[in-house]
Amino acid sequence: MSTNIITTEGHEALKKELDHLWRVYRPEITQKVAWAASLGDRSENADYQYNKKLLREIDRRVRYLRKRLEDVKVVAYSPEQEGKVFFGAWVEIENDEGETMKFRIVGYDEIYGRNDYISIDSPMARALLKKEEGDEVVVHTPTGEATWYVSSIRYGQGVSTD
């Protein structure tokens, strides 16, 4: 089960996606379905079948987004978070071999398509919560334990640790 929290930026992105699907993409596909239906026999009409399927997928996503936007709690940055890892933080960590990782801890709905975002529900994020720069973090993974050290913690929209 995923945690029902989201960053302000993530919430805005979901609202933007919903708006685009409902105002732009769905009307476009609805027109294509109507055009394909006007051609006659729908049973062998690939355009009709494809666009009808696409319309169902759009409607499914719209329902999901509407429900999700009602259910999630937006967690905004607070100055009290400075110096420790909390939700929304950009974190850089390093291990004993000198390997580094940089990422932001966000909600479940925000991680897709982003290599630099991890879910608050991930083992790494859970291990990092409330840690400070210089702290050692032991992460329990399916392959065993991994030890990392917190190199830097930053907050802010669009902030990266690059």
UniProtKB/Swiss-Prot annotation:
SUPFAM superfamilies reported for this sequence: FKBP-like, GreA transcript cleavage protein, N-terminal domain
Molecular function terms from GO: DNA binding; RNA polymerase binding
Stretches of the chain forming a coiled coil according to its record: 52-73
Keyword match Coiled coil: yes
Keyword annotations: Coiled coil, DNA-binding, Transcription, Transcription regulation
Pfam families: GreA_GreB (PF01272), GreA_GreB_N (PF03449)
Superkingdom of source: Bacteria
Keyword Transcription regulation: yes
Recorded family membership: Belongs to the GreA/GreB family. GreB subfamily.
Protein role: Necessary for efficient RNA polymerase transcription elongation past template-encoded arresting sites. The arresting sites in DNA have the property of trapping a certain fraction of elongating RNA polymerases that pass through, resulting in locked ternary complexes. Cleavage of the nascent transcript by cleavage factors such as GreA or GreB allows the resumption of elongation from the new 3'terminus. GreB releases sequences of up to 9 nucleotides in length.
UniProt-recorded name of the protein: Transcription elongation factor GreB
Gene expressing this chain: greB
